[in-house]
Amino acid sequence: MQLTPQEKDKLLIFTAALVAERRKNRGLKLNYPEAVAYISAAILEGARDGNTVSELMSYGTTLLTRDDVMEGIAEMVHEVQVEATFPDGTKLVTVHNPIR
């Protein structure tokens, strides 16, 4: 299978997000990479589903709360930026202060 660097990045995000989702479902608090991967994967999937950039920027703030992450992680994640593929092309989605 021949993958571009961008496709490899998306697969890595998806794999990390699966680990994060399983840990979250078991009641474990997510660390920094897990939290970012969890939010990033949701944004990528939302773009494929046809949501707009502004919808995804709002949606990204609803995915995790301070109770879902380890102490101090919410303060570390100031923004999450994901280059997502939309029906009309690739766009950068930025979610500011995603963990509230």
Curated annotation (Swiss-Prot):
Keyword Chloroplast: no
Record-given protein name: Urease subunit gamma
Record organism: Nostoc sp. (strain PCC 7120 / SAG 25.82 / UTEX 2576)
GO MF term (any one): urease activity
Pathway: Nitrogen metabolism; urea degradation; CO(2) and NH(3) from urea (urease route): step 1/1
EC code(s) of this entry: 3.5.1.5
EC category name: hydrolase
Known partners and oligomeric status: Heterotrimer of UreA (gamma), UreB (beta) and UreC (alpha) subunits. Three heterotrimers associate to form the active enzyme.
GO BP field: urea catabolic process
Compartmental location: Cytoplasm
Entry keyword Cytoplasm: yes
Catalysed reaction equations from the record: urea + 2 H2O + H(+) = hydrogencarbonate + 2 NH4(+)
NCBIfam families attached to this UniProt entry: PRK13241.1, urease_gam
Coiled-coil spans in chain: none
Keyword tags: Cytoplasm, Hydrolase
Stored Pfam families: Urease_gamma
SUPFAM superfamilies recorded: Urease, gamma-subunit (SSF54111)
One Gene Ontology CC term in the entry: cytoplasm
Domain of life: Bacteria
UniProt family annotation: Belongs to the urease gamma subunit family.
CDD domains membership: Urease_gamma
